[in-house]
Amino acid sequence: MNKTTKKLILFLLVFNFLFTLFGIKVNDVKAEGLEVLKTHTGSDLTYRGSNEKVYKLSEYNYPTNQLRAVWVTVFASDISGYTSEAQFKQMMNNVLDDMDKMGMNAIVFHVRTHNNALYKSSLNPLASWWSEVDFDVFDPLEWLINACHQRGIEFHAWLNPYRISGDGSNSQYVAEALPAVNPANDENNLIKVGNNVIFDPGIPEVRSFIVDTCMELIENYDVDAIHFDDYFYIDGADDTSTREKYNTENLSIGDFRRKQVDLFIEALSNEIRAYNQENHKAVQLGISPSGIYKNGGYQKAPTYDANGNLTMPTYSNTSGFAHYDDYLYSDTLNWINHEWIDYIMPQCYWAIEHSGANFVELTKWWSWAVRNKKVNFYTGLGIYMGADPSTEGSYKYWKYNENEIQLQLLNAGQYPEFDGACFYKYSSLKQTSSDIVNHAVNLISNDYWAKKIPGAISKYYAPLLDEVAPTMINYDEQTSTISFNEVENSRGYIIYKVPKGTIGRCFW
């Protein structure tokens, strides 16, 4: 083959991310072909309490923008504590290497587990796992964020806003005394149930403090998102004195508590968006609640009001723990409707054949919930259930299908609203004794996620992001080097390479 026929035309498309890693969608068309999803016995899977068949993509559609993430936490032993700069770098480079092999483009990294900080903070005490850190010498979080961005990986800072301890104290998992400004110093700001201690979400000073905590992180570190999971109120909480003081509208217990969490989410959203506007950034606010918002029955199709808010069904076709009511009291649908959050990542951890709350019911409902809204929808994937050898309870349904993750991705992929997925958790993906895990890792590493792509573009910030082409583009054929002028304020660049004669078709 001569040199001419070997030559590849380099088609350079450059996207200005304006301080973000979010790319512009080149092709958002979902595959047309669908087929019925089969149970492990070969019968057609139907939605709970109905004869309606469940469908999935007949073939994976290989999107060009999609969040592909994993949760990583020291609290659940995904990684070990910090002992030295060399140890930390080696440990996290191993994690990032694994993520690269699996085609992942985002890490959800635990930076606040219990009113503590795995970063430099004047508001929260240093976490016990990082007791050996000397920030005057080395800042592990700053290094990690830079290492992620160099690999094209978004960094989502995962915080537990209210949780303080599980040992009855006001300072568990900390390596130093509470700063004087930390409201955990005052027991009147806390709710205690047995040994479990949280901040009282109904106290304005508490809400302001947590907003300040998030903003301190955003202002000092180049994070791409603030991320909360499903910890809000706790089971058995007694906030009688708080309600007596602040429940001026005479709301029910449930309505009062939901309002307190609403006030916090709205305030934080406003602060982040004001910061973004002033600093030309696009830091996101994401929530990963438990999978069920409310329980209900089967409904064929959704209905919406004039503002695009989902009016029916305001519940999924499920039976299980729901976070709207007792005891979490988090009104995530309200946050979606008001577009206070940039993404929702429900923990749709149950298998496709779960009897009470399966994956297919939840992905359908959440896709309905975000429709018409500038809120991205990602699913949390419960690979830990596949990694665990247990066949009891919810775990047994994960053992029905060795290709459970493949079925979940194909089912979710049929919805235009589906923007990606996140595995819980990193250490579970390392459980090579599990055939289910091995199938999932091989699938994403060698096929579905084999080609690394940019994360899903934020629907809220999309209108603010411009596509900017660089100038002075040069290609040195001898050294296969491309050079071009830097585009100011860009996080990164995407380069597409296509064989000669195939311009217009994108190869990854």
Which residues are covered by each model-predicted region?
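Catalytic domains of carbohydrate-active enzymes, especially glycoside hydrolases
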Residues: Q90-A117, N220-A225, N334, W340-I344, ...
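Conserved aromatic anchor
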Residues: Q478-S490
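Glycine-rich, aromatic-flanked loop segments that form ligand/cofactor-binding clefts
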Residues: S50-S58, N65-A69, M104-R112, D139-I191, ...
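Substrate-binding cleft of secreted/luminal carbohydrate-active enzymes
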Residues: Y329-G356, A369-L464
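Recognizes extended acidic, P/S/T-rich segments that occur
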Residues: G492-W508
